[in-house]
């Protein structure tokens, strides 16, 4: 298998799909051919990702059998493209071969998907994915010396194992992202294995790779969840806002062309159609670079790079400069006498234009806030256009926009103040209690992960000049992850209402939630309050995870207690751990002190 070189197959966070059509222009043909060659050269990696995401429980050995089968299929089709099997969509071929593996569908409980065909089967495989991967064993780790020996002796096997383990734990992450992570992983391994201090090098250089994966995972799940719960129109408006901020000089007609190119058929990437996702990501990149003069002045150098590098370059490029002739506000949406008539003539285009004009004038606002303003404007016109004097009614729209922005800003300022007062750990415990109270039905691991991500939003953003947009964007991703990708996911009535009622106002909805009154706590178990000397032998990170899990389980068990009472019990726990780990006999100390924690 050839060395992966897909670092640039990303555009912002836009791994989106569109219908596959044969290229007609020379530039399109060149782009299609280079993308096709990449897919052919990396069929093994692509198969690993698809199989590991569709059948997360499958063993590495089972995956190897499918890889061998897919490579043979590719070789047959390259030798004779007229074979009947070569006219099928790659994702259909892959799923057919997965279903044909003897005993596999029954062993891993997906035989019901194999009884379906085409779109129904693809959707079934998608719904079979599990975001909570607690059923998988811990991520296998190697001693740095062993890892380097494995890399030097069998690089291909190490990379295959790595991609398999990462893909099965991230079933909704798009293929280009996972391939890019594999590129970065190999770069880290190759560089650090030549260093004398391999441990420090691997630990330090692995952090940005992990952060990259987490960030893209959250975003992609968020947008796929929006697509499945709210439909294409919401995704369309998300990208109008994003692209208008990034490229404020773009013409509206060109923007809509790009947005449609980007968001028209998002299904492929969200479903896990790996080949289609890669093809269409490349097409989006080509679209941008073929129209760069009318899109942005910041991407010229990026577009001169080859396909593997240009995407990453565009991601890292700054927002384009605001056009000098762009007024601070666009009056035609609030001052014109004909607003209602223009809205009625073509509502979708009218509100798309409003989103475009408002977003490119407000690069300081978050995407959720821009969508809230669009919703407020829609609601305002729905009311005003039914009055005797519509212009006199919607003339004050800007006041409404400023009012909601001020409200959102105060929420962020209050949360950042909490962070400053409580510190990182204190804020995390605050959110672990809060999230567990509103969604106690979630698994302990999922709640711990959500709490960590919420705290990351504040530690990342609360010291930045663009604090508001940063916090609001990242916190919205956390709630998107809580809601999940699957449209059929249910947690409890209050949470489900926030997840499914209004995408733009999802976060304010969550902020207003109280403890779930429908929840029935599990029976009391003294095991929760029983600790042993191994607590003292845990490394810092492991001890922190145990502490976080204890707090979540404590809230689940004593759901009726106030935050202050829960904090008091948690303080008792922390004091016992501190006391016993300093004792001459930690085990004896834990046996004596543990029962007192829950009292």
From Swiss-Prot:
Subunit note: Forms a 1:1 complex with Wnt family members; interacts with WNT1, WNT2B, WNT3, WNT3A, WNT5A, WNT7A, WNT7B, WNT8, WNT9A, WNT9B, WNT10A and WNT10B.
What organism does the UniProt record list as the source?
Answer: Homo sapiens
Q: Report the InterPro entries cross-referenced here.
A: ALB/AFP/VDB, Serum_albumin-like, Serum_albumin/AFP/Afamin, Serum_albumin_CS, Serum_albumin_N
Q: Entry's PROSITE patterns? A: ALBUMIN_1 (PS00212), ALBUMIN_2 (PS51438)
User: Which pairs of positions does the record mark as disulfide bonds?
Assistant: 77-86, 99-114, 113-124, 148-193, 192-201, 224-270, 269-277, 289-303, 302-313, 340-385, 384-393, 416-462, 461-470, 483-499, 498-509, 536-581, 580-589
Q: What does this protein do?
A: Functions as a carrier for hydrophobic molecules in body fluids. Essential for the solubility and activity of lipidated Wnt family members, including WNT1, WNT2B, WNT3, WNT3A, WNT5A, WNT7A, WNT7B, WNT8, WNT9A, WNT9B, WNT10A and WNT10B. Binds vitamin E. May transport vitamin E in body fluids under conditions where the lipoprotein system is not sufficient. May be involved in the transport of vitamin E across the blood-brain barrier.
Q: Where is the signal peptide?
A: 1-21
The domain of life is Eukaryota
* One biological process term in Gene Ontology: protein transport within extracellular region
Q: In which tissues is it expressed?
A: High level detected in plasma but also in extravascular fluids such as follicular and cerebrospinal fluids (at protein level).
**Keywords in alphabetical order:** Disulfide bond, Glycoprotein, Protein transport, Repeat, Secreted, Signal, Transport
* Cellular component, GO annotation: blood microparticle; cytoplasm; extracellular exosome; extracellular region; extracellular space
UniProt modification remark: N-glycosylated; more than 90% of the glycans are sialylated.
Q: Where is this region: Binding pocket for hydrophobic ligands?
A: 215-319
Subcellular location, record wording? Secreted
Recorded family membership: Belongs to the ALB/AFP/VDB family.
**UniProt note: domains:** The second albumin domain forms a deep binding pocket that contains palmitoleic acid (in vitro). Palmitoleic acid is most likely not the physiological ligand. Instead, this pocket may accomodate the covalently bound lipid moiety of Wnt family members.
Q: What is this protein called?
A: Afamin
Positions bearing carbohydrate: 33, 109, 383, 402, 488
Give the Albumin domain ranges.
Answer: 22-210, 211-403, 404-599
């Amino acid at each position: 298998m050839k060395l992966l070189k897909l670092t640039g197959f990303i555009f912002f966070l836009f791994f989106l799909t569109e219908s596959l059509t044969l290229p007609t222009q020379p530039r399109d043909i060149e782009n299609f051919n280079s993308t096709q060659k990449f897919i052919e050269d990396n069929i093994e990696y692509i198969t690993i990702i698809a199989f590991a995401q569709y059948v997360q429980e499958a063993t590495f050995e089972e995956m190897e059998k499918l890889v061998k089968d897919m490579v043979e299929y590719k070789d047959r089709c390259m030798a004779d493209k007229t074979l009947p099997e070569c006219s099928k969509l790659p994702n259909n071929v892959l799923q057919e071969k997965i279903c044909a593996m003897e005993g596999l569908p029954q062993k891993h409980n997906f035989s019901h998907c194999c009884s379906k065909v085409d779109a129904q089967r693809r959707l079934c495989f998608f719904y079979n994915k599990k975001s909570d991967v607690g059923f998988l064993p811990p991520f296998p780790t190697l001693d740095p010396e062993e890892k380097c020996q494995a890399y030097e002796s069998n690089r291909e096997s190490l990379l295959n194992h790595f991609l398999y383990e990462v893909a099965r734990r991230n079933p909704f992450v798009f293929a280009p992202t996972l391939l890019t992570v594999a590129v970065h992983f190999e770069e880290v391994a190759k560089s650090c294995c030549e260093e004398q201090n391999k441990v420090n090098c691997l630990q330090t250089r692995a952090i940005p790779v992990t952060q990259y994966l987490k960030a893209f995972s959250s975003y992609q799940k968020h947008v796929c969840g929006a697509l499945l719960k709210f439909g294409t129109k919401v995704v369309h408006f998300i990208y109008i806002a994003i692209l208008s901020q990034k490229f404020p000089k773009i013409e509206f007609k060109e923007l809509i062309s790009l947005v449609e190119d980007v968001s028209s058929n998002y299904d492929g990437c969200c479903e896990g159609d790996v080949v289609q996702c890669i093809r269409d990501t490349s097409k989006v990149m080509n679209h941008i670079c073929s129209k760069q003069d009318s899109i942005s002045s910041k991407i010229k150098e990026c577009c001169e790079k080859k396909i593997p590098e240009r995407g990453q370059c565009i991601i890292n490029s700054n927002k384009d400069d605001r056009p000098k002739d762009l007024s601070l506000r666009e009056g035609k949406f609030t001052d014109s006498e004909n607003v209602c008539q223009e809205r009625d003539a073509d509502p979708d285009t009218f509100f798309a234009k409003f989103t475009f004009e408002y977003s490119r004038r407000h690069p300081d606002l978050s995407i959720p806030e821009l969508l809230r303003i669009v919703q407020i404007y829609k609601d305002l016109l729905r009311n005003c256009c039914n009055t005797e004097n519509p212009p006199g009614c919607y003339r004050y729209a800007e006041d409404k926009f400023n009012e909601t922005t001020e409200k959102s800003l105060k929420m962020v300022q209050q949360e950042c103040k909490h962070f400053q007062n409580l510190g990182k750990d204190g804020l995390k415990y605050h959110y672990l209690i809060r999230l567990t109270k509103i969604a106690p039905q979630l698994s302990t691991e999922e709640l711990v992960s959500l709490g960590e991500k919420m705290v990351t939003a504040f530690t990342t953003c609360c010291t930045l000049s663009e604090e508001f947009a940063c916090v609001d964007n990242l916190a919205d991703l956390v709630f998107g992850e809580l809601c999940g990708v699957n449209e059929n996911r249910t947690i409890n009535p209050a949470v489900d209402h926030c997840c499914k009622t209004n995408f733009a106002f999802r976060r304010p909805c969550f902020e207003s939630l109280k403890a779930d009154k429908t929840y029935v706590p599990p029976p009391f178990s003294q095991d929760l309050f029983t600790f042993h000397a191994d607590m003292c032998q845990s490394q810092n990170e492991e001890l922190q995870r145990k502490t976080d899990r204890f707090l979540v389980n404590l809230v689940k068990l004593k759901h009726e207690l106030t935050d202050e009472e829960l904090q008091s019990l948690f303080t008792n726990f922390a004091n016992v751990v501190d006391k016993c780990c300093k004792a001459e006999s930690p085990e004896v100390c834990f046996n004596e002190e543990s029962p007192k924690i829950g009292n």
